[in-house]
Amino acid sequence: MMDDFITVTDVVENTFCEKFTYFSLVLGLKQYEEKRGVVISGKDLHIKHEKTNKTYLPLNIEGKKIIGMKFFSKRLSLSGKIDEAIETDDEVILIERKYTDYTDIGNTIKVQLGLLSILINENLKKPVNTTIVIFSKKHTIKKIVPIDQEILNFALNRLEYTKNIFLSCLNPTQQYSNKCINCCYRKICPVGSLYTGL
């Protein structure tokens, strides 16, 4: 049993690149997010909506608004914080905000939505059947993402893979891709540094 909780963010980062887990959780290297403009802008967006949108309910959904709540699962050794959610009589609708104009629902978002849905279900004893992802940068676009068993299974598999790297302390193999260019670990990563020239 792990002494520490893996966070949803840890698993999302593992989905983005498996070496992230090795550098951040095994070696304990900081990401220095305070030096990354997009990350700072994204956090500012979350803080803004936590403070100013306390009663706003999107798509005319009636229910109790939940903002910035952190959940834990001792069973999964997992923790995660939600941006916003609306609790109705029989379900919870999760709302995630993204500071980007890239509106594809990729694997990292699916993992995040899946794991947060599991945490909500365990803690509030209500299912998450629907999530709303709000993309905000130049434009605001809302996408509704149903939470099905495929997303939940995919998210749980990525969680187990993240734990395995953490527990084994093994550096996973990874192929170079365009995402290496903006990776915070590119200067020390044997894959990213060879191609970025840094």
Q: Positions of the model-derived regions?
A:
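Short, charged, amphipathic alpha-helix that recurs within catalytic cores of restriction-modification
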Residues: 108-120
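Short histidine-centered catalytic/ligand-binding loop motif
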Residues: 98-106, 145-149
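Alpha-helical structural motif
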Residues: 7, 15-19, 112, 151-158
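Structural motif
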Residues: 4-15, 108, 171-178
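Short glycine/proline-enriched turns and hinge-like loops at secondary-structure junctions
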Residues: 77, 107-108
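Metal-dependent nuclease catalytic regions and adjoining charged, substrate-binding loops involved
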Residues: 64, 68-69, 74-75, 122-198
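Short, histidine-centered active-site or binding-site loop motifs used for metal coordination
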Residues: 97-101, 135-138
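Metal-dependent nuclease catalytic cores that hydrolyze phosphodiester bonds in DNA/RNA
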Residues: 1-94, 101, 194-198
